[in-house]
Amino acid sequence: MYTTTLNKIRLHNPCTGGWAKLLKTLGKTQADDDPVPLSLILQSNGLEDAIWTLQCLEGADREIRLFAVDCARQVQHIMTDQRSVEVLEVAERFANGQATSKELGTSRAAAQAAAWAAAWDTADAAADAAWDAAWDAARVKQAEIFLKYFGE
């Protein structure tokens, strides 16, 4: 189980609403160094705030990268360019110490080029509609994945 503290969160300038919500959930009025489970932040504030809080963790780079890869794999079936799939494989290998930062950078650049190429080919209206539907479905699954890596 991963935890952070209110003091660590405060150092990263959280949004006012999310901060107030978390303090209220914890029954506190100010920051302290008591451990706060990330799963509680997910439950209290939702996935976006829980993901934002990952920047407050130390020593969780591997899990954060694997979480990102796992979330991206949820939409891998709609990736039409092999470079996008390959960057997931390299990122996962990198997280597990099986790829170099140079390999990761090269595959990331290739995937970004693929993303730009795809973006120019997509009509804005269709993209917006698809994004909204996919976003809603993906957020539910991503909350489950978040708990897999950072829950109790």
Task: List the predicted regions and their residue ranges.
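Short, glycine-biased loop/turn motifs at secondary-structure junctions and
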Residues: M1-E152
